[in-house]
Each structure stands twice: as structure tokens, then as C-alpha cells.
Amino acid sequence: MIQKLKDFKLTPENTYYATGKRKEAVARVWLLRDRPNTFIVGSDKTNKEYDLREYVQRETLYNKIMYPFKVTGHEGKFGIYATVRGGGISAQAEAIMYGVAKALLQHNPDLRPTLKKAGLLTRDAREKERKKYGQMGARAKYRWSKR
């Protein structure tokens, strides 16, 4: 049963908010203290809301999103509501993962060393390289002919 964000009473006492980014994907993540095991992803593009497993479809991406909970031992203690836009499904999953890690840090700042050691607080800054003029792409060149 999928619930809408408006169905949750979002107050500073029962939610933790953070933003995660990866490539072109941006995820706004709310951790819901009162609703454990509720995982909803809302796509800004389609204005639909999905169950997390239904949205990411691949088990590896689902495990990647849940990794911050596993590392800190907070499995089953929070629900996730996230809205994502931009990028592909893999980048969106990593953006949600990064947002979850930052939101857990808001919940308990003592988790910082654990999350840092797992590499969850370092944003992956790799972006697509821009196309250069006079070339086919970022690195690919047009075929050169001497005559």
C-alpha cells in the first residue's frame, strides 16, 4: 500500500531531511521515524509514487540504498520517502543512498565515523565531460585526413 507524502505528518520531531546528488540525479530524502519499513519514491517527472523495490527494480540498487542502515545498525527503524529527478536509475539510487546517509547523520551525529569509514559521506563528484567544439564528443575526434 503506497501512501502519499501528504499522508505523513512531517514535523522536525519525526523526520530527518537531506539531499543527495549523483551525476545529474538529485534526491530529496525524508527519514520517517514513525513509519518504519515504509519505502516510497516519488518521481518529480511523472508525479507518481512507487514502492522502493518497484522503482529501482534491481536488487543490487535496493541493497545500495539500504546500505547506510545496514552499516549503522538502523535497519527497520526508519521509513524512507524520497523524490528524485534527473539522471538514470543507477545514479538516482546512489543519490538516494547519499541522502539517507546524510539524514542519518542528522539523526545521530555520532554515526559520522561509521558512515565516513564506509565511504557514504563522500560525494562522488564524477560528472559527464562536456563536448568540445571541433570534435565529435568529449574526447572523440573527427577523422583527420592529410589531403
UniProtKB/Swiss-Prot annotation:
UniProt-recorded name of the protein: Small ribosomal subunit protein uS9
PROSITE patterns reported for this sequence: RIBOSOMAL_S9
Top-level taxon of origin: Bacteria
GO terms for MF: RNA binding; structural constituent of ribosome
GO cellular component: a single term: cytosolic small ribosomal subunit
Region (Disordered), start-end ranges: 128-147
Keywords: Ribonucleoprotein, Ribosomal protein
NCBIfam families cross-referenced by the UniProt entry: PRK00132.1
Naturally occurring in which organism (per UniProt): Aquifex aeolicus (strain VF5)
UniProt record, GO biological process: translation
Family listed: Belongs to the universal ribosomal protein uS9 family.
